[in-house]
Amino acid sequence: MANQGDFPKRTETKKRPLHNIYGKEILRKRLEEENFSRTTLSFYRYVILENVQELRDQLYAEWEILGVLGRIYIAREGINAQLSIPSHNLDFFRKNLDSRNQFKDMQFKIAVEDDSKSFLKLDLKIKKKIVADGLNDDAFDVTNVGKHLSAEEFNLHMEDENSIVVDVRNHYESEIGHFENAILPQSDTFREELRILLELLNGKENHKILMYCTGGIRCEKASAWLKHHGYKDVNQLHGGIISYAHEVSQKGLESKFKGKNFVFDGRLQEAIGNEVISSCHQCGAKCDRHVNCENPGCHVLFIQCPSCSEKFEGCCTLECQNVLHLPKEKQKEIRKGKLNENRFFSKSKIRPKISELYHGILFKSSK
């Protein structure tokens, strides 16, 4: 890795593959051995990109030299990136983006909290869309987006009786943190969210709509979608929750966001407010700790307190805990569905199901 002040250069002569070739253990060890800090950030832009495959390969080669780790999606319609970079290479990375007109003057959303371990590898994928929305972009004007509001403006408009605050994230995100009095659609995906929004906001076309998401990208498409359906006063939080937290801190504003901000990297969350507004899905204790089930065949994301983590060995259900103690070959058979055709391993609204399972069955049997 290049030292601060040195422009990183590729020194090897052998052509390197333009994808990760190492396992998680090696990647984790490398990350732990780094003796410098990293900056976690995100950015996006809707912009027409040409020769996407060629661009993807160029970016991978250039960003690998800079030590970039993260998840980046590029498509004909633009780029969506969540990544970490050695802090001493941040200026070089900015210059790299600015060297392409499509990415010039990109706005970064810097993480509110950062342990320098948000990502293990560089994963740069070509997608049909940079956000999976299920929409036909030819059917409406995707550029006719809502008005962008600063944190101060967003707070002010929240006081308006005619305002409706709408969370444009999935239910497992809003569960651990959201704005006061916001509508919280119980969706698993952004595609589903857009359909639910029209149902929840039916008849409120003349209200002031205040939308927000993590970094702003989902609001771009959702606001245009609502305006297409006749909503006249559609607004969105500029830069999302991440930028809101920074502006509130810098200007000494009141934070109307309660709890934590869910993030799609190794951190899983970052503190915005001090409140814990969610509960353990297994015992009901106050908790906002997201984990993945330790059963490799499940790996579902759910909220688990330290006590239940010890009791269930990090698993979401007794079934998964039992699977965890089976021989490895038997576990593989289960994951393939050979021994469990009706298995419980599903991400679709699994989180509330876990809660219902434990409150409805385990708690009832203990009385």
UniProtKB/Swiss-Prot annotation:
Task: Provide the E.C. number(s) assigned to this enzyme.
Answer: 1.14.-.-
Residue ranges constituting the Rhodanese domain according to the UniProt record: 159-253
* Reaction equations catalysed: uridine(34) in tRNA + AH2 + O2 = 5-hydroxyuridine(34) in tRNA + A + H2O
Q: Does the keyword Hydrolase apply?
A: no
GO molecular function term, any single one:
oxidoreductase activity, acting on paired donors, with incorporation or reduction of molecular oxygen
Question: What's the superkingdom here?
Answer: Bacteria
Keywords of the record: Oxidoreductase, tRNA processing
Supply the InterPro entries for this chain: Rhodanese-like_dom (IPR001763), Rhodanese-like_dom_sf (IPR036873), Rhodanese_C (IPR022111), TrhO (IPR020936), TRHO_N (IPR040503)
State the similarity comment.
Answer: Belongs to the TrhO family.
* Protein name, entry field: tRNA uridine(34) hydroxylase
Specify the taxonomic lineage: Bacteria, Pseudomonadati, Spirochaetota, Spirochaetia, Leptospirales
Per the record, the gene is trhO
